From Swiss-Prot:
The lineage of its organism: Eukaryota, Viridiplantae, Streptophyta, Embryophyta, Tracheophyta. It comes from Oryza sativa subsp. japonica. Residues 43-159, 170-323, 408-531 form the Plastocyanin-like domain. Its cofactor is Cu cation. One of its GO terms (cellular component) is apoplast. Its main location: secreted. Lignin degradation and detoxification of lignin-derived products. Cu cation 3 binds at residues 140, 453, 510. Cu cation 1 binds at residues 93, 451. One of its GO terms (molecular function) is hydroquinone:oxygen oxidoreductase activity. This is Putative laccase-5.
Length: 547
């Protein structure tokens, strides 16, 4: 089947090193779009913010936490000029944007660009092609995304509606996050130095607000106002650093209509689970005669970790209008019944409900034939402690994370500029790939939300235990599998995805738990140029940051 057991070094592949041949001729083709050009400016600066009665200076975009909402239409060109006024290096990723032929705008530091240094600037310039729905943007350097994130809403083209009944109104997007009283850069730096697990967050947040279940936080409660008997569109984004989250609204049923900016067959649920990096669009139908003026919206963690984790519940308020009821306390709020923190069955049942529309207008273009079969093991492990150091990981080791037992080491220059010397997996243009991600239990079974840059993929199968290459493919869904950019490898299980490698460039794939990313759970695909000018990478921009 040609399944690689280890990552291949692109330096040994002459075809891989030819993939940037377009640069030799610099085919600076104009970007054709019928949409508008929308300009935004990001001034990245330190700002004092107070939560849980703790004031600290955090990185922000334009002084906002969370950052500004970006709104475009399908087909628009988005130009974001970033000015870094901090001492930290920074880069920004436009999570879920395909960046066709334009990896220079993708954003992960040392993969597609060197980071923007303090005092420097860079313009992210890209066109949103063939996508509509809810995505988001975030920093992609160290743990800076704990504060640097915001929604990216892609409206359908003018004149195009939704493939579901038009809602009465759209509610503001809700971004789930984590708040640390400590400096998060100090948290991860200490963990990497000692080899121990990092300290956990102090609270979960709704749009940066912890809510009334935490001490000194009642005034920092996020509220959503609705009217009785209406249907609203609600966009959810899990921007938490290290936690998958359950979500529910007391006494309300939700209808899921989109996942990762891809429409799905609508289904109802009282409780959702959403992994870091994932987005969902919901229809919320309010009660015609509500029994209470206010209801709790709650998030709580899902995890099977053997270590410590933030086992708290954050609450926001759904407030029916007109009402003057106080929503700052939590004693009288009806709370939604969320599953127990380690309820893997609830997660599996929810995940199994996702199906693509698979209609003529929104087809599921899942590859039926496969050119390349790849099996990657993903999980946690340990590295030996250096001889001159005392380490605080298991049995005096250092925590590590890996794909196929290889922990990714951050390069000193961007892979997109020097990919021939780095460990990547090369793919010929237009290769159809089946990727099986198998979880391991070396340091305990955990789920791993894997995010792929540059592509969406179809989730054709998943299960518990070890993947069976003989029998499991017979149960694949090749008719209407869900299309996503982030999928969670089940705890103690596997997931199979398929995608078409039709986007030339170097594309990162990594666990969206930032602690696992910091420990090395990532890799990169190198997709070679195709034969046609329209299948080759665009040349680098003149202001590309230098390392």
């Amino acid at each position: 089947m040609g399944t690689p057991r280890g990552l291949r070094n692109a330096g040994s592949s002459s075809s891989a090193c030819r993939f940037l041949a377009a640069f030799a001729v610099l085919l600076a083709l104009p970007t054709l779009t019928a949409g508008l050009t929308r300009h935004y400016t990001f001034n990245v600066q330190m700002t004092n913010v107070t939560r849980l009665c703790v004031t600290k200076s955090i990185p922000t975009v334009n002084g906002q936490f969370p950052g500004p909402k970006l709104v475009v239409r399908e087909g628009d060109r988005l130009v974001v000029k970033v000015h870094n006024h901090m001492n930290y290096n920074v880069s920004f990723h436009w999570h879920g944007i395909l960046q066709l032929r334009n990896g220079w705008a993708d954003g992960p530091s040392y993969i597609t660009q060197c980071p923007i240094q303090g005092g420097g600037s860079y313009v992210y310039d890209f066109t949103v092609t063939g996508q509509r729905g809810t995505l988001w943007w975030h920093a992609h350097f160290s743990w800076l995304r704990v504060h640097l994130y915001g929604p990216l809403v892609i409206l359908p083209k003018r004149g195009e509606g939704f493939p579901f009944p038009r809602p009465y109104k759209e509610l503001p997007p809700i971004m789930f996050g984590e708040w640390f009283n400590a400096d998060t850069e100090a948290v991860i730096n200490q963990a990497l130095q000692t080899g121990a697990g990092p300290n956990i967050s102090d609270a979960y947040t709704f749009n940066g607000l912890p809510g009334p279940t935490y001490n000194c936080s009642s005034k920092d409660t996020y509220k959503v106002k609705v009217q009785p008997g209406r249907t609203y569109l609600l966009r959810l984004i899990n921007s938490a650093l290290n936690d998958e989250l359950f979500f529910g609204i007391a006494n309300h049923t939700l209808t899921v209509v989109e996942a990762d900016a891809n429409y799905v067959k609508p289904f109802t649920a009282k409780t959702l689970v959403i992994s870091p990096g994932q987005t969902m669009n919901l229809l919320l139908t309010t009660a015609p005669n509500p029994g209470s003026p206010v209801y709790a919206m709650a998030i709580a963690p899902y995890t099977n970790t053997q270590g410590t984790f933030d086992n708290t519940t954050a609450v926001a308020v759904l407030e029916y209008a007109p009402t003057r009821a106080s929503a700052t306390g939590n004693n009288n709020l009806p709370l939604p019944p969320l599953p127990r923190y380690n309820d893997t069955n609830a997660v599996a049942n929810f995940s199994s409900k996702f199906r693509s529309l698979a209609t003529a207008r929104y087809p599921a273009r899942v590859p039926r034939a496969v050119d390349r079969h790849v099996l990657f093991t993903v999980g946690l492990g340990t590295d030996p402690c250096p001889s001159n150091q005392t380490c605080q990981g298991p049995n005096g080791t250092k925590f590590a994370a890996s794909i196929n037992n290889n922990s990714f080491v951050r390069p000193r220059v961007a892979l997109l500029e020097a990919h021939c010397q780095r460990r990547v997996v090369p793919l010929a243009f237009n290769t159809s790939v089946e990727l099986v991600l198998q979880g391991t239990s070396i340091q305990g079974a955990e789920s791993h939300p894997l995010h792929m840059h540059g592509f969406n993929f179809f989730v054709v199968g998943q299960g518990f235990g070890n993947y069976d290459p003989v029998n499991d493919p017979a149960n694949y869904n090749l008719v209407d599998p869900v299309e996503r950019n982030t999928v969670s490898v089940p705890t103690g299980g596997w997931v199979a995805v398929r995608f078409l490698a039709d986007n030339p460039g170097v594309w990162l794939m990594h666990c969206h738990f930032d602690v696992h990313l910091s420990w090395g759970l990532s890799m990169a695909w190198l997709v070679n140029d195709g034969p046609l000018p329209s299948q080759k990478m665009l040349p680098p921009p003149s202001d590309l940051p230098k390392c």
